[in-house]
Amino acid sequence: MCIRDRYRVSALQTARLLADRALSGVSRGHLRLAPTWTPEEASVVIQIRLPRILSAALIGAALSAAGASYQAMFRNPMVSPDLLGASTGACFGAALAILLGASYAVITAGSFLFGLAAVGLTYLVGRLSRMRSNLAMVLAGVMVGSLFSAGTSFIKLVADTNEQLPAITYWLMGSFTSASYQKILIGLSLIHI
C-alpha cells in the first residue's frame, strides 16, 4: 500500500468536516447564539458570518492549489508562492498602489501584476544562473522576495502615518470583514479560470 493512499480524503468528507466546523463555530465567540435564532441573529449568521466562512474556505483552497501547482511545476515539494517571491511582489504592488492613492481595483490589479512580475524576475534570474536547477530557482526567489520585501518596508517608511500606513498594514494583514456573496462568486469565477 502506498503511503499516499493511506491519507486520501474525499471532497465530500472535506466538505462535511468544513460544514461541521462552520456550524459548530456559530455559537462560539464573543456573542453566543442559542440553537434557535431571532431574525437579527439569523441575519448576522447568514449575511455576515457565512460569507466570511465561505471566503476563508475558498481562499484556503486557492492557496492550496497554488502551492500544489508550484510544487508540480518546479518538481520540488519545498517550493511555494512565497518562496518564489510572488507573495512579497504582490505586497509591494499593493503598498505602492496605496501610496499613490489608487482605487481598490487598481490596488488589486497592482498586487496581482507585481506578483506575476516577481515570479517572472525569479524565473529570469534562475535561468541566467550557472546552476540551472530547481535550487537556483529557489535561491533566486529568496533574492527577489528580499528585494520586494525591502521595497515594501521603504514604502511603509515614507507613507503618511495617518492614512496610508494603516491602509498598507491592514491590506498586508488581510481581512474577511468585507466578504459578501457577490465577492465569493467573483472569486469563484477567477479561481476557476
Labelled PLM ranges:
Residues R4-I191:
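Alpha-helical transmembrane segments in inner-membrane proteins
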